[in-house]
Amino acid sequence: MYGIEYTTILIFLTSITLLNYILKSITRMMDYIIYRFLLIVVILATIINAQNYGVNLPITGSMDTAYADSTQSEPFLTSTLCLYYPVEASNEIADTEWKDTLSQLFLTKGWPTGSVYLKEYADIAAFSVEPQLYCDYNLVLMKYDSTQELDMSELADLILNEWLCNPMDITLYYYQQTDEANKWISTGSSCTVKVCPLNTQTLGIGCLITNPDTFETVATMEKLVITDVVDGVNHKLNVTTATCTIRNCKKLGPRENVAVIQVGGANVLDITADPTTTPQTERMMRINWKKWWQVFYTVVDYVNQIIQTMSKRSRSLNSSAFYYRV
């Protein structure tokens, strides 16, 4: 009887010792694997340069400021550049080979053939309906026109900032704007926007909610409308929904992979919506030339300096996606 008990105890102690040895062996093996893995990660991290999409650069820039005309020593081998220009530029140049010529000129500044895309738009109004900015860097050329100054300012505000937008059902709901960053953005072939502010009893202030003719008109037959109303007040809206889509949008911050180059005009357009803030010229630049070839030559000369005022992003702007960052 005692022999059986001693044997049981001996087996138990032996099992514990063996288990302890196995656990220590596994621990040493795991430590070896983990330390080796970390060593490999550290070595690779020093070799590989990863793209950081979260860098916020201090953005200033105006072609009114004197920049040194020089070529970057490091070519942008892994980036794409989109240059948007009005159709009047190609009409004036009237040369079927002009894009090839321009591509070769960009090559002298370090931009390989195939990395620069030249995209044409009809006019400011048409470009406002569905701006699509898909390249790593996007330069938009806008010819100054005193009759379209406000349209240019709205378009610049749209494409130079990131917006988070949601659809609005204006037939069922009232809407209010919560702060200065909250705007209603309407786009379409023809947008007429009317608003009626409401009091706490949901009665119209200076208007009848049942009669859109009494509403205040904030836009008439435009292609892009950024509507700003009194914050914290409910509004009944009337929009030409057959030809226009309105969205409730929140400005998230600057879209740093886009720059606007204004061609002509006495001063760079100010896109500041809030009158209490300092005027903004972030990534808004101006050059003055009568001929479009001179404009393109200047863009090529200064393209690398302009890119330095921007930040490469993986996001794109697409109106069909409610301008949301994708």
Swiss-Prot record:
<feature type="binding site">
    <location>
        <position position="206"/>
    </location>
    <ligand>
        <name>Ca(2+) 1</name>
    </ligand>
</feature>
<keyword id="KW-0325">Glycoprotein</keyword>
<feature type="binding site">
    <location>
        <position position="228"/>
    </location>
    <ligand>
        <name>Ca(2+) 2</name>
    </ligand>
</feature>
<feature type="disulfide bond">
    <location>
        <begin position="191"/>
        <end position="244"/>
    </location>
</feature>
<dbReference type="GO" id="GO:0039624">
    <property type="term" value="C:viral outer capsid"/>
</dbReference>
<protein>
    <recommendedName>
        <fullName>Outer capsid glycoprotein VP7</fullName>
    </recommendedName>
</protein>
<dbReference type="InterPro" id="IPR042210">
    <property type="entry name" value="VP7_2"/>
</dbReference>
<dbReference type="GO" id="GO:0046872">
    <property type="term" value="F:metal ion binding"/>
</dbReference>
<dbReference type="InterPro" id="IPR001963">
    <property type="entry name" value="VP7"/>
</dbReference>
<keyword id="KW-1038">Host endoplasmic reticulum</keyword>
<keyword id="KW-1015">Disulfide bond</keyword>
<feature type="signal peptide">
    <location>
        <begin position="1"/>
        <end position="50"/>
    </location>
</feature>
<keyword id="KW-1152">Outer capsid protein</keyword>
<comment type="similarity">
    <text>Belongs to the rotavirus VP7 family.</text>
</comment>
<feature type="region of interest" description="GPR motif; interaction with ITGAX/ITGB2">
    <location>
        <begin position="253"/>
        <end position="255"/>
    </location>
</feature>
<feature type="disulfide bond">
    <location>
        <begin position="165"/>
        <end position="249"/>
    </location>
</feature>
<comment type="subunit">
    <text>Homotrimer; disulfide-linked. 2 Ca(2+) ions bound at each subunit interface in the trimer hold the trimer together. Interacts with the intermediate capsid protein VP6. Interacts with the outer capsid protein VP5*.</text>
</comment>
<feature type="binding site">
    <location>
        <position position="216"/>
    </location>
    <ligand>
        <name>Ca(2+) 1</name>
    </ligand>
</feature>
<feature type="binding site">
    <location>
        <position position="301"/>
    </location>
    <ligand>
        <name>Ca(2+) 2</name>
    </ligand>
</feature>
<dbReference type="Pfam" id="PF00434">
    <property type="entry name" value="VP7"/>
</dbReference>
<feature type="glycosylation site" description="N-linked (GlcNAc...) asparagine; by host">
    <location>
        <position position="318"/>
    </location>
</feature>
<comment type="function">
    <text>Calcium-binding protein that interacts with rotavirus cell receptors once the initial attachment by VP4 has been achieved. Rotavirus attachment and entry into the host cell probably involves multiple sequential contacts between the outer capsid proteins VP4 and VP7, and the cell receptors. Following entry into the host cell, low intracellular or intravesicular Ca(2+) concentration probably causes the calcium-stabilized VP7 trimers to dissociate from the virion. This step is probably necessary for the membrane-disrupting entry step and the release of VP4, which is locked onto the virion by VP7.</text>
</comment>
<feature type="disulfide bond">
    <location>
        <begin position="82"/>
        <end position="135"/>
    </location>
</feature>
<feature type="glycosylation site" description="N-linked (GlcNAc...) asparagine; by host">
    <location>
        <position position="238"/>
    </location>
</feature>
<dbReference type="GO" id="GO:0039621">
    <property type="term" value="C:T=13 icosahedral viral capsid"/>
</dbReference>
<feature type="binding site">
    <location>
        <position position="231"/>
    </location>
    <ligand>
        <name>Ca(2+) 2</name>
    </ligand>
</feature>
<keyword id="KW-0946">Virion</keyword>
<feature type="binding site">
    <location>
        <position position="229"/>
    </location>
    <ligand>
        <name>Ca(2+) 2</name>
    </ligand>
</feature>
<keyword id="KW-0106">Calcium</keyword>
<feature type="disulfide bond">
    <location>
        <begin position="196"/>
        <end position="207"/>
    </location>
</feature>
<keyword id="KW-0167">Capsid protein</keyword>
<feature type="binding site">
    <location>
        <position position="177"/>
    </location>
    <ligand>
        <name>Ca(2+) 2</name>
    </ligand>
</feature>
<feature type="binding site">
    <location>
        <position position="214"/>
    </location>
    <ligand>
        <name>Ca(2+) 1</name>
    </ligand>
</feature>
<keyword id="KW-0945">Host-virus interaction</keyword>
<keyword id="KW-1146">T=13 icosahedral capsid protein</keyword>
<feature type="region of interest" description="CNP motif; interaction with ITGAV/ITGB3">
    <location>
        <begin position="165"/>
        <end position="167"/>
    </location>
</feature>
<dbReference type="InterPro" id="IPR042207">
    <property type="entry name" value="VP7_1"/>
</dbReference>
<keyword id="KW-0732">Signal</keyword>
<dbReference type="GO" id="GO:0044166">
    <property type="term" value="C:host cell endoplasmic reticulum lumen"/>
</dbReference>
<keyword id="KW-0479">Metal-binding</keyword>
<feature type="binding site">
    <location>
        <position position="95"/>
    </location>
    <ligand>
        <name>Ca(2+) 1</name>
    </ligand>
</feature>
